[in-house]
């Protein structure tokens, strides 16, 4: 009996006495349980895991959040929210700009994290797991009408402010002839917090469609302006912020900002160019009754893929725009008997002509050669 009273007091201290701790009141059912084996660490803190599941029927806008948000959340939590909306609808999530959990270890969220999973009858897909303070998680629109949100904290360090996730449902309807790149910015507001989202009537931008869009731009600035006409300058600055949670080794080793525009221009400038190519002399000269030394020579021939990523680049071929013939001196052998003494009549130094490409052009089916 004393243990039950103790557990009740602890639950009130950590959760129940904080209004709006978990979710906005909608149709919901809650299941909570605490491990029966209570343990304490050296500081006399409870170290067992408190688990709680909540089922939420998404019929309007609402939110879920870490306990005590925007203050430090408690330790030893495993909280789960199951969000379900009506059939033929989807669920959209947007994180509050105040976001902070315990930092990752070796770029992996091992200890404190929030995770979003998309659930269907046949599979469960993890849409993301986040921790740390560097970046706010992106907005998420589900592909099904069911989402699972999990928050876990361990028995060591805690952080603040935790997290707050705003949710709403969107109609799962797509116009028949909608353009894949037709994005429209709309604003939704929950409790005074606004964010931008794609129009709910537009289809999700596929990777192929996105690739075609990226190929139309020559600079990062123009590309970001296309996607975010209002916030593109902030997006450009954020590209070069030090965010080690998401950066690879090459980011930390370099001394200056990477010039993405120059890299893109180099691809278009140098992809279709003359380059060293080895040719077999017998095959190149189409001679079957002679052998040469050396057997192969280096020549300049056009090669490349006509600027990977440019519009219609897959329909283009890299061909010679200017070809010249150059002489090469080689040793030629002809079949027959070789004398061990005296001058061999079937062996001599000869000059041969080979084609060299001095200029290369991209020949595309959609336009004539230049």
Curated annotation (Swiss-Prot):
Q: Does the keyword Secreted apply?
A: yes
Q: How is it modified after translation?
A: Activated by proteolytic cleavage. Proteolytic removal of the N-terminal CUB domain releasing the core domain is necessary for unmasking the receptor-binding epitopes of the core domain. Cleavage after Arg-247 or Arg-249 by urokinase plasminogen activator gives rise to the active form.
Q: Does the keyword Glycoprotein apply?
A: yes
Q: List the disulfide bonds.
A: 109-131, 302-360, 306-362
Matching InterPro entries: CUB_dom, Cystine-knot_cytokine, PDGF/VEGF_dom, Sperma_CUB_dom_sf
Give any single GO term for biological process.
cellular response to platelet-derived growth factor stimulus
Q: Where would you find this protein in the cell? A: Secreted
PROSITE patterns noted in UniProt: CUB, PDGF_2
Provide the Gene Ontology terms for cellular component.
extracellular space; membrane
Q: Which residues form the signal peptide?
A: 1-23
Q: Name one Pfam family in it.
A: CUB
Q: In which tissues is it expressed?
A: Expressed at high levels in developing heart, lung, kidney and some muscle derivatives. Moderately expressed in liver, brain and testis. In the kidney, localized to glomerular mesangial cells and vascular smooth muscle cells. Up-regulated in areas of renal fibrosis. In mice with unilateral ureteral obstruction, expressed in interstitial cells at day 4, with an increased to maximal expression at day 14.
- Site, as annotated: Cleavage: 247-250
Task: Please list the residue ranges annotated as the CUB domain.
Answer: 52-170
Q: Which UniProt keywords apply?
A: Cleavage on pair of basic residues, Developmental protein, Disulfide bond, Glycoprotein, Growth factor, Mitogen, Proto-oncogene, Secreted, Signal
Which residues of this chain are annotated as glycosylation sites?
A: 276
User: Which SUPFAM superfamilies does the record associate with it?
Assistant: Cystine-knot cytokines, Spermadhesin, CUB domain
Q: Name the major location.
A: secreted
Which ranges form a coiled coil? none
Which Gene Ontology MF annotations are present?
Answer: growth factor activity; platelet-derived growth factor receptor binding
Q: How does it assemble?
A: Homodimer; disulfide-linked. Interacts with PDGFRB homodimers, and with heterodimers formed by PDGFRA and PDGFRB.
- PANTHER family linked: PLATELET-DERIVED GROWTH FACTOR, PLATELET-DERIVED GROWTH FACTOR D
Q: What does this protein do?
A: Growth factor that plays an essential role in the regulation of embryonic development, cell proliferation, cell migration, survival and chemotaxis. Potent mitogen for cells of mesenchymal origin. Plays an important role in wound healing. Has oncogenic potential and can induce tumor formation. Induces macrophage recruitment, increased interstitial pressure, and blood vessel maturation during angiogenesis. Can initiate events that lead to a mesangial proliferative glomerulonephritis, including influx of monocytes and macrophages and production of extracellular matrix.
Please report the name of this protein according to its UniProt entry: Platelet-derived growth factor D
- Species source reads Mus musculus
Task: Name the gene that codes for it.
Answer: Pdgfd
């Amino acid at each position: 009996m004393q243990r039950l009273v103790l557990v009740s007091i602890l639950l009130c201290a950590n959760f129940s006495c904080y209004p709006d701790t978990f979710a906005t009141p909608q149709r919901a059912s809650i299941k909570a349980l605490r491990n029966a084996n209570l343990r304490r660490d050296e500081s006399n803190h409870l170290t067992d895991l408190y688990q709680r599941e909540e089922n939420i029927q998404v019929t309007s806008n609402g939110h879920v959040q870490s306990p005590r948000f925007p203050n430090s959340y408690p330790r030893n939590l495993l909280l789960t929210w199951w969000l379900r909306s009506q059939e033929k609808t989807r669920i959209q999530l947007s994180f509050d700009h105040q976001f902070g959990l315990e930092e990752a270890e070796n770029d992996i969220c091992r200890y404190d994290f929030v995770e979003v999973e998309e659930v269907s009858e046949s599979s469960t897909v993890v849409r993301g797991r986040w921790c740390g303070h560097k970046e706010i998680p992106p907005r998420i629109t589900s592909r099904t009408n069911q989402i699972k949100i999990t928050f876990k904290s361990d028995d060591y360090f805690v952080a603040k402010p935790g997290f707050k996730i705003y949710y709403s449902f969107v109609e799962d309807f797509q116009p028949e002839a909608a353009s894949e790149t037709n994005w429209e910015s709309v604003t939704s507001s929950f409790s005074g917090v606004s964010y931008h989202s794609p129009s709910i009537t537009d289809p999700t931008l596929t990777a192929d469609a996105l690739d075609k869009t990226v190929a139309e731009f020559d600079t990062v600035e123009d590309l970001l302006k296309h996607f975010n006409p209002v916030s593109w300058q902030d997006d450009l600055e954020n590209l070069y912020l030090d965010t080690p949670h998401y950066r690879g080794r090459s980011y930390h080793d370099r001394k200056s900002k990477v010039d993405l525009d120059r890299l893109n221009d180099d691809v278009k400038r140098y992809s279709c160019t003359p380059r060293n190519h080895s040719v077999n002399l017998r095959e190149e000269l189409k001679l079957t009754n002679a052998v040469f030394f050396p057997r192969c020579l280096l020549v300049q021939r056009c090669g490349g893929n006509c600027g990977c990523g440019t519009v219609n680049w897959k329909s283009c071929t890299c061909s010679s725009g200017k070809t010249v013939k150059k002489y090469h001196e080689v040793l030629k052998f002809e079949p027959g008997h070789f004398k061990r003494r005296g001058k061999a009549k079937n062996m001599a130094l000869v000059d041969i002509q080979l084609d060299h490409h001095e200029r290369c052009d991209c020949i595309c089916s959609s336009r004539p050669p230049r």
